[in-house]
């Protein structure tokens, strides 16, 4: 492209290189602009160049950006007009390892969309939420979580023209295993204090928790989960949005209510409460926990609408997988609709410490 450039004709610039860096901190670029008196107008739309192509392999010993840091960052980045494509990304961060592929593309309206598929190996959950500012939501924060996280994540995240993430537009699906974990002072769990002693619910420790999850339309969907702990044996399902509105459906075996750790239900529970017999002589109490606005409430799940939540989850899951497959080919075609859920086993497996 250089001869055309010298002649004054439009020409694409092509770069191929290997880059090695001891330390990289993108925030220092802005500091240098401020030191030289250059204007930093953050309201200007960010536009990717239309006449640039490059392939760069990179090795970065230390990467820092705001509250996030990583070591031994390696990978390759390819750029063609309006598309950054990062492949074979590998880095050590958050006390573990992260690897995967991702891309960022600019739309015709100057907005952006990011897409990625990542694998996580033994990263610290609390440090992750702290580094990413709780991912822009308030319903579960760093102080509510503890443990080591491994798993996989497929993600679509839109950005506006200023490269600000649009959290409400996030679409994601993944599988994870949390080891040596804890759920601490989590409000929906604390609402069960009418039935379980509050001291048992403040911090719930578990040895291992395995599950899949997905996020769409501003909701985190939680399929049925069997929880066995020293606090109680529960079955939980529900959904939780990023504005901290939630609806959970909880099933507690009535035999648990006779133990010393659980409070007895209000009088006339069997007459007015919602109970269920599993056919084996084990009767369960059905509860519903709802929070809309600032007020949370626990009630008997008389209509057992947990079944409707379960159906909603199945529908949203199929829709999500279609989106990820049709737009980015993240899943094989036969895995989107043909695969039937296992009706015998819950999607969650929780192994609790004795």
Where would I find each of the regions flagged by the language model?
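Surface-exposed edge beta-strands and adjoining flexible/disordered loops or tails in beta-rich
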Residues: 3-5, 16-18, 304-312
């Amino acid at each position: 492209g250089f001869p055309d450039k010298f002649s004054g004709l439009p020409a694409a610039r092509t770069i191929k290189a290997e880059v090695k860096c001891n330390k990289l901190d993108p925030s220092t670029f802005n500091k240098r602009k401020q030191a030289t008196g250059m204007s930093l107008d953050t309201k200007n739309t960010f536009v990717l160049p239309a006449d640039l192509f490059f392939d760069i392999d990179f090795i970065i010993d230390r990467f820092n950006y705001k509250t996030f840091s990583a070591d031994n960052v390696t990978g390759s980045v390819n750029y063609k007009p309006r598309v950054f494509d990062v492949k074979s990304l590998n880095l050590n961060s958050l006390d573990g390892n992260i690897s995967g592929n991702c891309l960022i593309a600019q739309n015709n309206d100057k907005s952006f969309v990011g897409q990625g598929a990542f694998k996580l190996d033994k990263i610290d959950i609390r440090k992750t939420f702290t580094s990413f500012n709780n991912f822009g939501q308030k319903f579960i924060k760093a102080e509510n979580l503890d443990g080591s996280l491994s798993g996989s994540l497929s993600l679509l995240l839109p950005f506006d023209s200023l490269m600000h993430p649009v959290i409400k537009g996030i679409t994601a699906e993944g599988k994870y295993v949390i080891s040596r974990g804890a759920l601490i002072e989590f409000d929906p769990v604390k609402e069960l204090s009418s039935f379980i002693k509050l001291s048992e619910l403040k911090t719930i420790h578990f040895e291992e928790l395995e599950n899949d999850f997905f996020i769409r339309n501003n909701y985190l969907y939680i399929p049925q989960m069997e929880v066995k702990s020293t606090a109680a044996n529960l079955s939980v399902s529900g959904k939780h949005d990023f504005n901290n509105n939630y609806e959970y459906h909880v099933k507690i075996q009535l035999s648990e209510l006779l133990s010393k750790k659980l409070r007895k239900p209000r009088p006339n529970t069997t007459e007015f409460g919602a109970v269920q017999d599993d056919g084996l002589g084990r009767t369960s109490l059905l509860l519903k926990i709802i929070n809309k606005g600032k007020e949370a409430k626990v009630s008997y799940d008389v209509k057992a609408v947990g079944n409707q939540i379960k159906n909603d989850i199945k529908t949203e899951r199929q829709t999500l997988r279609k989106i990820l497959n049709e737009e980015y080919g993240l899943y094989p075609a036969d895995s989107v609709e043909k695969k039937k859920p296992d009706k015998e086993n819950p999607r969650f497996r929780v192994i609790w410490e004795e």
